């Protein structure tokens, strides 16, 4: 009998070792990882990150935020790359989004925030309330008020919700949990313009889309916008718990001493890993190669699955790919796992692929072959 709350549906499988883009179970079986721990180990199990962690662990891994932390300054500088942002570090995407919600309200003096139907921003009370999915709120009582949910990719539905008390609009550029649904370019451009002209802050939730996942460091770079606030987590430290909220420097006074904080946020172990990740991702040619390989994966996968009657669409952005299907998701996940490939689901009818950015062409071909076999079997 387990000593754990049963709030997860766990497969009867444990991974105890990893090398590069592969996981190994207790029996020594090898699996190609197209899930990256739900978009976390974006670099696979990378030796450079491992060395950074080992080196930092031998020195000091935590100090309180009552003292200077040069590693936080280093990571913040790398994240903003010369742009006029300030950074706050925490431990997760939910915490990062909580910080974004708080600073948006405090900086504007307004309370209402518009998010989107089928969005996902986290499971803490504020981030859960921001999420446009009722299923994750069942049984927890009244949500935090003043959140309103627009229709994704529909600017008119946003405008209809705006009042004199609206502080911000909060958006995922790809709705990952609901089925890998990319935002349309025209919508994002028009939304950013509308927010700017009407004094609304634009918050971009990059928890899943950030850190190279879409082929650029941040997904908003694909859309040619610069948000007032954006949030990061998942891939930032490649598996070490960390989150970050970045906001324009003009809002710095909203987070003065005592206004917000995190005991573990920005600890030296997480910052050492984050710094190593950023060094790898910003190395000349790295993200360009990842983008090229992701395009190859999506193109070849679309071609390979054309004969599968149960596949209705392959879509995504970079290495964030959804296979929409009428087949049973549970059976597909198990069948791919049995063949040595780990994948995810999203929404009610999508197989979600979040592979490491470090995939080789051979590994891509291997994954496509397994997926083709599985979908042919479940045709």
Swiss-Prot record:
GO BP terms in the entry:
L-arginine biosynthetic process
Q: Does the keyword Transferase apply?
A: yes
Binding-site residues, N(2)-acetyl-L-ornithine:
123, 262
Pathway field of the UniProt record reads: Amino-acid biosynthesis; L-arginine biosynthesis; N(2)-acetyl-L-ornithine from L-glutamate: step 4/4
The alphabetical list of record keywords is: Amino-acid biosynthesis, Aminotransferase, Arginine biosynthesis, Cytoplasm, Pyridoxal phosphate, Transferase
What InterPro entries does the record point to?
AcOrn/SuccOrn_fam, Aminotrans_3, Aminotrans_3_PPA_site, Class-III_PLP-dep_AT, PyrdxlP-dep_Trfase, PyrdxlP-dep_Trfase_major, PyrdxlP-dep_Trfase_small
Positions of disulphide bridges: none
Q: What class of enzyme is it?
A: transferase
What subcellular compartments does it reside in? Cytoplasm
Q: Tell me what reaction this enzyme catalyses.
A: N(2)-acetyl-L-ornithine + 2-oxoglutarate = N-acetyl-L-glutamate 5-semialdehyde + L-glutamate
Binding locations of pyridoxal 5'-phosphate: 93-94, 120, 205-208, 263
Entry's Gene Ontology cellular component terms = cytoplasm
Top-level taxonomic group: Bacteria
Tell me which cofactor or cofactors this protein depends on.
pyridoxal 5'-phosphate
Relay the cofactor remark from the entry.
Binds 1 pyridoxal phosphate per subunit.
User: What Enzyme Commission number(s) appear in the record?
Assistant: 2.6.1.11
N6-(pyridoxal phosphate)lysine: modified positions: 234
GO function term, MF aspect, one: pyridoxal phosphate binding
Q: What else is known?
A: May also have succinyldiaminopimelate aminotransferase activity, thus carrying out the corresponding step in lysine biosynthesis.
Instruction: Give the family per the record.
Output: Belongs to the class-III pyridoxal-phosphate-dependent aminotransferase family. ArgD subfamily.
Task: Summarize subunit and interaction data from the UniProt record for this chain.
Answer: Homodimer.
User: Mind telling me what this protein is named?
Assistant: Acetylornithine aminotransferase
Q: Which organism is it from?
A: Streptococcus mutans serotype c (strain ATCC 700610 / UA159)
Q: What is the lineage of its organism?
A: Bacteria, Bacillati, Bacillota, Bacilli, Lactobacillales
